[in-house]
């Protein structure tokens, strides 16, 4: 871990007592003129420069921000490894309410901090930051992706994210039912924002039956008007209890799989775009005990990170789609490893990712 001499005591406590992941570097950033306070955490650069987004969030204190950055950076190492990218994992968090303090001056200052790492960290969008923000950051830092097409970027990544989740569903169907086709399968989608909407399109094109819910009723109404065959239910609680549900796709908030939802879930497969779907590590065992196949979220939702990584080399949609299509094979390999080792799929994915990172370190 990097030297953080002079950091507040609560931050030091978080760094040295909460970091069990062997992070390589943590940078505390402050620019008084713009009001910037940020944390950049690099978990691993074994496979290449750390890649991960910038989260802009009103954390209660610096220690909470550091803890989130450490956790998110570690997650990106595993995601990037399983996506087959030549990138390690990193994450940055900017402390504060973006609605209150986000400014061009602050984003430019942040870009200078990222640039000071000399390419060890490549940033992108995350919660609270958008394509337009990355355009500003890129004015001070060439190690920025997730930019607008007008500024050399690829733009919205929801198309490839949904395509990757769709490939994960096909892999689950192949593993469980011996056939990757989703025709006549019933798929329930919780959250039909940009990613969920595109996922609906893929499923309908293949002849699946689709059931949806979203807290934004106007979004659901627009979707069902456009696709009358789509069935809407009141809420997620109703969705997970739908009779004869084959696949459940959490595509909204994290923690969708928990002690309350798993016991009543009727689906045989869980495969969705939401991050951090498992509320706690014991949930996956609960799923397995009920005979429910779980496709690890960070594997199947990797289409977005595949896109932003490709942007660094001059974005090509067809090349990205071909890479995202490999999520099918990767997911099948995870299920096979899980069966071979007698462990849940998420644990199998972690083992494969750790093996790839260890092999990369050994080659150095």
Curated annotation (Swiss-Prot):
Record-linked Gene3D superfamilies: Leucine Dehydrogenase, chain A, domain 1, NAD(P)-binding Rossmann-like Domain
Entries under CDD domains matching the protein: NAD_bind_Leu_Phe_Val_DH
Disulfide bonds: none
A Gene Ontology BP annotation from the UniProt entry: valine catabolic process
Binding annotation for NAD(+): 191-197
Activity modulation comment: Inhibited by pyridoxal 5'-phosphate (PLP).
Top EC class, one word: oxidoreductase
Keyword ATP-binding: no
A GO cellular component annotation in the UniProt record: cytoplasm
Active site: 91
Alphabetic keyword roster: Branched-chain amino acid catabolism, Cytoplasm, NAD, Oxidoreductase
Alphabetical list of InterPro entries matching this protein: Aminoacid_DH-like_N_sf, Glu/Leu/Phe/Val/Trp_DH, Glu/Leu/Phe/Val/Trp_DH_C, Glu/Leu/Phe/Val/Trp_DH_dimer, Glu/Leu/Phe/Val_DH_AS, Glu/Phe/Leu/Val/Trp_DH_bac/arc, NAD(P)-bd_dom_sf
Subcellular location: Cytoplasm
Reactions catalysed: L-valine + NAD(+) + H2O = 3-methyl-2-oxobutanoate + NH4(+) + NADH + H(+)
Main location: cytoplasm
Molecular functions (GO terms): valine dehydrogenase (NAD+) activity
Subunit-level organization: Homodimer.
Family: Belongs to the Glu/Leu/Phe/Val dehydrogenases family.
Name of the protein in its database record: Valine dehydrogenase
